[in-house]
Amino acid sequence: MTHKSVRDYIRTIVDFPHEGILFRDVTTLFADPRGFRIAIDQLLAPYAGMRFDKVAGLEARGFILGGAVAHQLSTGFVPIRKKGKLPGRTISVSYQLEYGEAVVEVHDDAIQAGEKVLLVDDLLATGGTAEAGIKLIEQLGGQVVGCAFVVDLPDLGGRKRLEAMGMEVHALCAFEGL
């Protein structure tokens, strides 16, 4: 029997959402029970023996992964959402997009000072959203002790951006090219 790698479960869609883009679709990974289990196990592998107080996931596919990772670790899950999607009191950080600006938010009581947090998302591109998530966690007094992604797009420089912030970055696979 041939064993598939996580990368083998990810479908590439040409010209989505715009012409010239190769969209790395992880929903095919999520839909396969074996692939999804492999991904969760591999996301956690570098952190064996470490203790986390919370797992934070970036909207939207980071919620799927982060929830599964938090369950596996028996810890809480913190959603980092687009502006205006969380009820109650929040804090926010804005960050630059290719054409404009975006804002992400987290509940102001989601993370306590000193808590160790693992940040999880499906894909690392430029690192802008992840950097904003890290800043939110740090504003609340949390410590990001790892950043775990299924896919890294190294040509877009996200890993270097996060590593320049002192972050440990773990990705299950990389896709070169845009």
Swiss-Prot record:
It is an enzyme of class 2 (transferase). Pathway: Purine metabolism; AMP biosynthesis via salvage pathway; AMP from adenine: step 1/1. The keyword Transmembrane does not apply. Its EC number is 2.4.2.7. GO terms for molecular function: adenine binding; adenine phosphoribosyltransferase activity; AMP binding. It is found in: Cytoplasm. Disulfide bonds: none annotated. One of its GO terms (biological process) is purine ribonucleoside salvage. GO terms for cellular component: cytoplasm. Gene3D superfamilies: 3.40.50.2020. It catalyses: AMP + diphosphate = 5-phospho-alpha-D-ribose 1-diphosphate + adenine. SUPFAM superfamilies: PRTase-like. The keyword Cytoplasm applies. Belongs to the purine/pyrimidine phosphoribosyltransferase family. Catalyzes a salvage reaction resulting in the formation of AMP, that is energically less costly than de novo synthesis. PANTHER family: ADENINE PHOSPHORIBOSYLTRANSFERASE (PTHR32315:SF3). Homodimer. HAMAP family: Aden_phosphoribosyltr. This is Adenine phosphoribosyltransferase.
